[in-house]
Amino acid sequence: RDSVVNAARAVSVQVQSAIIQFSSNFQMALNPQITKTYAADDYKMMHKLIGRSSKFTFFFLLFLSLPIMIQTDFVLTIWLKTVPDYTVTFLRIMLCTTIVDSVANPLMVAASATGRVRLYQSVVGGILLAILPVSYIILETGGDPNSVFIVHLIFSVIAFAVRLFIIRPMIKLDLSEYMIILGRIFMVVCLSLPLPLLYHYYRDCLLYTSPSPR
């Protein structure tokens, strides 16, 4: 079982790394501007850049990841022929985690720009380090390998929220404005998922119910 899980994780990490590379290149243009506007005390423009970076990164990654997440079996079968167990679920959860971390990245850049990162790194780093013992406990108590990646996703969301509240006073961020951006992101998710999921479900129903050729 361990070898199957390791193979599944290796495949998932390969795909995740490619997606992360795309998002890093996309954000690279805005990151120096976030630092520059903080140095110039132009908080208003800095907040706009953080919002734009979070929003556009999310849209870009959703555009790349959604087809893969919906058609994971199909994509992996074409690529690998024989897909290791757990790979489909691992990859889907890891892509969700990647999107959360990428949306949070502008906040990390803003924290670095202030130079006051001790509290930020201690708290956020502590949250992320907790993934390891929590995952170990879950596995020791009979948890499924998928649970490790679910734990990672949950802790990434928690770390995102904590980042936001720690950084908010450091850069004078209007929390309500940023929450509006997150609300729009959530709305896009709600609007973009139903049709692809319905199509995927309908196609699978046709495949499983169609009579086999004689």
Predicted regions and their residues:
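Interfacial/gating helices of multi-pass transporter permease domains
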Residues: R1-S17, D85-T89
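Helix-loop junctions and terminal segments of transmembrane helices
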Residues: S12, Q16-S54, M108-A113
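Alpha-helical transmembrane segments of multi-pass membrane transport and lipid-handling proteins
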Residues: S23, H47-S102, L132-E140, C190, ...
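Short alpha-helical transmembrane segments in multi-pass integral membrane proteins
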Residues: L49, S53-M69, V124-L128, N146-R168
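Membrane-interface junctions at transmembrane-helix termini in multi-pass inner-membrane proteins
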Residues: L95-L128, G142, I171
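Alpha-helical transmembrane segments
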Residues: A110-A113, F165-M179
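Alpha-helical transmembrane segments of multi-pass membrane transporters
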Residues: L119-P145, F155-I166, R184-Y201
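Conserved small/polar residues in nucleotide/adenosyl-binding loops
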Residues: Y208-P213
